[in-house]
Regions:
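ASCE P-loop NTPase helicase motor core
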Residues: 27, 31, 36, 40-224
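C-terminal accessory regions
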Residues: 337-475
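Short, solvent-exposed amphipathic alpha-helical segments in soluble enzyme
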Residues: 88, 279-283, 449-453
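Short, conserved phosphate/pyrophosphate- and ester-handling motifs at nucleotide-, phospho-/glycolipid
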Residues: 22, 76, 268, 426
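Conserved SAM-binding loop
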Residues: 18, 72, 264
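Conserved pre-motif I regulatory segment
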Residues: 2-40
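Conserved helicase motor core of P-loop NTPases
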Residues: 6, 25-29, 37, 152-157, ...
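Short coil/loop residues immediately preceding or within conserved phosphate-binding loops
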Residues: 39, 323, 416
């Protein structure tokens, strides 16, 4: 098919006259598809309000109408769910698509790409890390390397990376490598790229997108010498919430849009903990440490519990990922062992079609400031459980017993009413509350600007800025 036909069909699928930036992206995409060389990739970068999501959906619908195979991927379960909703096609996480388990309790190797003539579209690509993760059980530990290797090992398969450079880069990295044409061309690929900068007219009436655009321009021009001033007047979708009104306002959000569509975003685990305790005690009136209906976030990858279920349910996911959210259905059998606290939970995972799983969880991580068990705590748990198998003669057999021990493999969890921005990234909620904590001009860093932009753009309907200072408010 000629490139011109692709262009016409994508514009038709879009349903309105594209902006100049969108038209350029459509032209570039058509050239990318028409290139006869297999070693080509495309980067579609765009910030909030520029129509990147709408254009991605139109591209997917056009490809399907032409009977072209497409695979939709995203870095997290929540991001995959959002991508699927926006495009009308199922999406999965990158990890679940490109890795397969080598052995029970073992590592995951790169799966063979059995697809042919397939377009792989990856949303929220700013989150894809490529720093080798120590002790990673996935492939090489470099996710971007593995993704590229996987896609191009399939016959006539191509990759489109979609994302927003203004968002926070992966932890430990200066920029998002998956959105860098220099980085992607380093794989021996010819890179087609397009940037959406023009904010759509309907987006200009949104306070969330107006202010996000102002913040993004500070990033683009690298000119942040003072904290950004936020415009509230004339925008019903962005409001300032004084601390003494927070409990009542949060309760209203829960009743209006539900817990699944409400999120508090903070700058640290410490602040998130304070919010989680306060929300449970003063908004939800929960006294028990855990109760049915509680929202949790998994804070460390876990393979053990899904393995147990795979014996009876082959459709069970290969693992539960760090950042996955779950709702408690039942709580049973609290017990103290090895100097830690454990409980049996029946969980439902809303981002995975309400998949249900029974686990033993570790409650010590619920209120700690560390992201998960500390190195010292992990070592203590290892030593204590290992001592239970002291009578087992050989070291390999002791390790085998340890790997099969439910307490050693207990799920590490935190409450999920308030999270850090890195944990919220990739997700969107109708109502988002942002607490930046105490800030001064002297504390201003590029990282803070990326943080603020990412936090603002998690909200789809209403943004609540908690205790927002007058010095950061546009008069």
């Amino acid at each position: 098919m000629y490139a011109i036909n692709y262009k016409t069909l994508i514009v038709q699928a879009l349903g309105f006259e594209p902006t100049a930036d969108q038209q350029h992206a459509i032209d570039t995409f058509a050239e990318f598809l028409a290139d006869r060389d297999d070693h080509v990739a495309m980067l579609l970068r765009g910030s909030a309000g520029t129509g990147k999501t709408t254009l991605s959906g139109a591209i997917v619908r056009t490809m399907l109408a032409l009977k072209q195979r497409v695979v939709l991927l995203a870095p997290t379960g929540r991001a995959a769910k959002v991508f699927a909703l926006n495009s009308g096609v199922p999406a999965s996480t990158i990890h679940r698509r490109i890795y397969r388990q080598q052995s029970l309790g073992g590592s995951f190797s790169l799966a063979p790409n059995m697809m042919t003539d397939t377009l792989f579209l990856v949303d929220e690509s700013s989150m894809i890390a490529n720093e080798g993760l120590r002790e990673s059980v996935f492939g090489t530990g470099c996710l971007l390397d593995d993704l590229v290797q996987f896609v191009y090992s399939g016959r006539n398969c191509r990759l489109v990376l979609i994302g927003d450079k203004a968002q926070l880069p992966p932890v430990g990295e200066e920029e998002s490598p998956a959105l860098s044409s220099a980085f992607i061309s380093g794989y021996g690929l010819t890179v087609y790229e397009s940037d959406l900068r023009e904010v759509l007219r309907q987006s200009q009436q949104s306070g969330i997108l107006y202010n996000a655009t102002v913040i993004r321009q500070m990033i683009a021009h690298d000119e942040a010498t003072a904290l950004p001033k936020i415009r509230f007047s004339g925008f019903p979708d962005i409001v300032c919430v004084p601390g003494d009104e927070l409990i009542e306002t949060l309760a209203t959000s829960y009743s209006q849009v539900g817990m699944d569509e409400t999120m508090v975003v903070t700058r640290s685990n410490k602040r998130a903990n304070i919010y989680n305790q306060g929300i449970r005690n003063q908004v939800l009136w929960r006294e028990e440490e855990l109760t049915s209906g509680d929202w949790l976030m998994v804070v460390k990858n876990s393979y053990y519990w899904t393995e147990q279920k795979k014996a009876e349910d082959t459709s069970a996911p290969a693992f539960i990922a760090n950042g996955d959210r779950a709702v408690i259905q039942r709580v049973r059998n609290r017990r103290d062992l090895y100097g830690f606290h454990f409980v049996d939970l029946w969980l439902q995972f809303p981002d995975y079609d309400n998949y249900e799983l029974q686990v033993t969880a570790l409650t010590d991580t619920l209120a700690t400031e560390a992201p998960a068990l500390t190195r010292e705590q992990s070592q203590q748990l290892f030593d204590e459980v290992m001592a239970d198998y002291a009578d087992v003669r050989t070291k390999p057999e002791r390790y085998k017993r340890l790997k099969a021990d439910p307490f050693y493999n207990a799920l590490q969890i935190k409450y999920a009413y308030a999270v850090t921005c890195h944990k919220a990234q990739g997700g969107q909620w109708a109502h988002v509350y942002v607490d930046q904590g105490y800030m001064t001009d002297e504390m201003l860093t590029p990282d803070y600007i990326h943080w603020l932009y990412t936090a603002f753009t998690r909200a789809t309907e209403k943004l609540f800025l908690v205790n927002w200072p007058k010095t950061q408010t546009e008069e």
